[in-house]
Curated annotation (Swiss-Prot):
Keywords (A to Z) from UniProt: Glycoprotein, Secreted, Self-incompatibility, Signal
Parts of the chain that traverse the membrane: none
Glycan attachment sites: N71
Name assigned to this protein: S-protein homolog 4
Source organism (scientific name): Arabidopsis thaliana (Mouse-ear cress)
Signal peptide positions on this chain: 1-23
Family: Belongs to the plant self-incompatibility (S1) protein family.
PANTHER family: PTHR31232, S-PROTEIN HOMOLOG 29-RELATED (PTHR31232:SF43)
GO cellular component: extracellular region
Biological processes per GO annotation: rejection of self pollen
Length: 152
């Protein structure tokens, strides 16, 4: 084998190895998620005319006390951590005679890499717990009990 032919074989082998390595990488969309912002929208659907007070926080951000009239909404935006399972926002909800909490955004549940992903996480807050909008079903049917257990 001539030197030139050996060089060409080496180039082809290296090229094939690079192609195989890149074929094992997930599509580039995973890289783009780190630049997207998620939006959480919370709507008062208590249904009895009660005002809903909520106070949402993460480990880094305190979003302050919000007061929602019946059917009123409030939204916030954030950039989830590029590290899976890290981003968490929890909210304390109160209305006459009640005090509840819920993880309104949990990367393990809502993150784009796992769970039931959402970029626009739209929540209706009812007396029995929060329900998230499903883009697949076009309905608020991803429901949880207070403090996080999924309802069937």
């Amino acid at each position: 084998m001539t030197t030139m032919l050996k060089t060409q074989v080496h180039v082809v082998v290296i090229y094939l190895l690079i192609q195989i390595a890149f074929s094992q990488v997930k599509p580039g969309s995973d890289l783009k998620w780190s630049t997207l912002k998620s939006v959480v929208t919370i709507t008062n659907r208590l249904g009895d005319g009660s005002t809903l007070k909520l106070h949402c926080k993460s480990a880094d951000d305190d979003l302050g006390l919000k007061i929602l009239a019946p059917n009123g909404s409030w939204s916030f935006k954030f950039r989830p951590s590029i590290v899976p399972g890290v981003t968490l926002f929890f909210c304390h909800f109160t209305w006459p005679g009640q005090s509840k909490w819920f993880n309104i955004y949990d990367d393990d549940r809502d993150g784009v890499r796992m769970g039931i992903p959402c970029i626009y996480c739209i929540w209706d807050i009812g007396k029995y717990g929060p329900c998230r909008f499903s883009e697949i079903d076009d309905a608020f049917n991803i429901c949880y009990d207070w403090n996080g257990n999924r309802r069937s």
